[in-house]
């Protein structure tokens, strides 16, 4: 069966540049990746074709040879026998090249000599109250993670034995092989890039050097921390494989909405409803603040809806600072409901006694509107 044209496989023109090739490959690889299409042989075949096409076209020399000779340029002395295919670990190498940054830097970059691998970073979501954000706290959390195996001390080898250098790659984790007119390097298919093999695996961790366990950790939440803040606990992530360094644990904080207060940076806002008569005649009321005290607010007569009163220093603490924000009281005026007959009579009498000076805003507004429409 004749091979499909590499350009057609990727859905690009022969004049496509490197950026267009990479973009086309990324979209197709994500669509047909085996993890998204388990047990789908057609998707697996398509994924291999996509990888093969991109491997050839991304290299200027290989692309030039293909443009000139077609598939014939790679049909002699290719890997895996006759067809110049991608036997062994080639697909993962290409996939890491494109998606390395998306997948934490790629496996090859996570490994060091001796097959050691850095552990994965972990994420833990924590929700706290506004009061806890105000005062700070120390929280105890339990995190399921991988820790270093205590039987083999992370080596992955059965006690009394040691890992050995891979005979295929001589401990380098990479092998070179001829493909057509070219010689390319790829991950060793025997040790999968680790450079070592474990003849006698540890009975507890089965050669991984780590086991799954739930750990208890203490997390310090500083006063003033905001919603969406990320706290990094270095070395508290997943244990590294075969003695590699541990990853980090990231605590992602969210602050619960408060019943009375809304936060904006270090400032707090509280909407307080007062009666119509209090707004007209003036008065006082107390508000509870997050520091556990009460503050008295004096409302002058004639206070309008939306009026703000500032309580200096009654807001949130500024993170890692001695400064604090302010608390703003926003006045809302409540219109009375379910009036008695006598209350209605008094309000009607009040309305009759009112003058333009009592309601300058509404009087002025309707006067301007009348002038606007009548000219």
Curated annotation (Swiss-Prot):
Listed cofactors: Zn(2+)
Q: Which locations, inside or outside the cell, does it occupy?
A: Cytoplasm
Question: What does the note accompanying the cofactor annotation read?
Answer: Binds 2 Zn(2+) ions per monomer.
Q: Where are the CXXCXGXG motif repeats?
A: 149-156, 166-173, 188-195, 202-209
- Residue numbers binding Zn(2+) 1: 149, 152, 202, 205
Keywords (alphabetical) are: Chaperone, Cytoplasm, DNA replication, Metal-binding, Repeat, Stress response, Zinc, Zinc-finger
Q: Where are the zinc fingers (CR-type)?
A: 136-214
What GO CC terms are in its UniProt record?
Answer: cytoplasm
According to its UniProt entry, one GO biological process term is: DNA replication
Indicate whether Chloroplast appears among the record's keywords.
no
Give residues annotated as binding Zn(2+) 2.
Answer: 166, 169, 188, 191
PROSITE patterns, sorted:
DNAJ_1, DNAJ_2, ZF_CR
Give the Pfam families listed for this entry: DnaJ, DnaJ_C, DnaJ_CXXCXGXG
Which residues belong to any copy of the J domain? 5-70
Function recorded in the entry? Participates actively in the response to hyperosmotic and heat shock by preventing the aggregation of stress-denatured proteins and by disaggregating proteins, also in an autonomous, DnaK-independent fashion. Unfolded proteins bind initially to DnaJ; upon interaction with the DnaJ-bound protein, DnaK hydrolyzes its bound ATP, resulting in the formation of a stable complex. GrpE releases ADP from DnaK; ATP binding to DnaK triggers the release of the substrate protein, thus completing the reaction cycle.
Q: What is known of its domains?
A: The J domain is necessary and sufficient to stimulate DnaK ATPase activity. Zinc center 1 plays an important role in the autonomous, DnaK-independent chaperone activity of DnaJ. Zinc center 2 is essential for interaction with DnaK and for DnaJ activity.
Which NCBIfam families does UniProt cross-reference here? DnaJ_bact, PRK10767.1
The entry assigns this protein to a family as follows: Belongs to the DnaJ family.
Report quaternary structure and partners: Homodimer.
Name the record gives this protein: Chaperone protein DnaJ
């Amino acid at each position: 069966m004749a091979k499909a044209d590499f350009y057609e496989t990727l859905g690009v023109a022969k004049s496509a540049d490197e950026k267009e090739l990479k973009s086309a490959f990324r979209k197709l690889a994500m669509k047909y990746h085996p993890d998204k299409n388990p047990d789908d042989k057609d998707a697996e075949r398509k994924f291999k074709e996509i990888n093969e096409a991109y491997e050839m076209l991304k290299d200027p020399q290989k692309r030039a040879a293909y443009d000139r000779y077609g598939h014939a340029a790679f049909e002699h002395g290719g890997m895996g026998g006759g067809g110049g295919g991608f036997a062994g670990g080639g697909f993962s190498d290409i996939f890491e090249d494109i998606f390395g940054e998306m997948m934490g830097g790629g496996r090859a970059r996570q490994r060091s000599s001796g097959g050691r691998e850095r552990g994965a970073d972990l994420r833990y979501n924590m929700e706290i109250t506004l009061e806890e954000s105000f005062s700070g706290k120390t929280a105890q959390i339990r995190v399921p993670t991988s820790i270093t195996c205590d039987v083999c001390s992370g080596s992955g080898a059965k006690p009394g034995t040691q890992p050995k250098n891979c005979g295929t790659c001589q401990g380098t984790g990479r092998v070179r092989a001829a493909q057509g007119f070219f010689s390319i390097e790829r991950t060793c298919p025997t040790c999968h890039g680790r450079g070592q093999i474990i003849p006698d695996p540890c009975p507890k961790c089965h050669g991984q050097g780590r086991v799954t366990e739930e750990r208890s950790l203490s997390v310090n939440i500083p006063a003033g921390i905001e919603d969406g803040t990320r706290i990094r606990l270095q070395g508290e992530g997943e244990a590294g494989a075969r003695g590699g360094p541990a990853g980090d644990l990231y605590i992602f904080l969210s602050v619960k909405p408060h019943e009375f207060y809304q936060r904006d940076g270090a400032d707090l806002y509280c909407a307080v409803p007062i009666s119509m008569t209090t707004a007209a005649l003036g008065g006082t009321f107390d508000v509870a603040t997050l520091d556990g005290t009460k503050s008295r607010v004096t409302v002058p007569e004639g206070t309008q809806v939306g009026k703000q009163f500032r309580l200096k220093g009654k807001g949130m603490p500024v993170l890692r600072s001695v400064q604090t924000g302010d608390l703003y009281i926003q006045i809302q005026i409540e219109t009375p409901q379910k009036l008695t007959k006598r209350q209605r009579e008094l309000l009607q009498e009040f309305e009759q006694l009112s003058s333009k000076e009592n309601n300058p805003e509404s009087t002025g507004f309707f006067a301007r509107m009348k002038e606007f429409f009548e000219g």
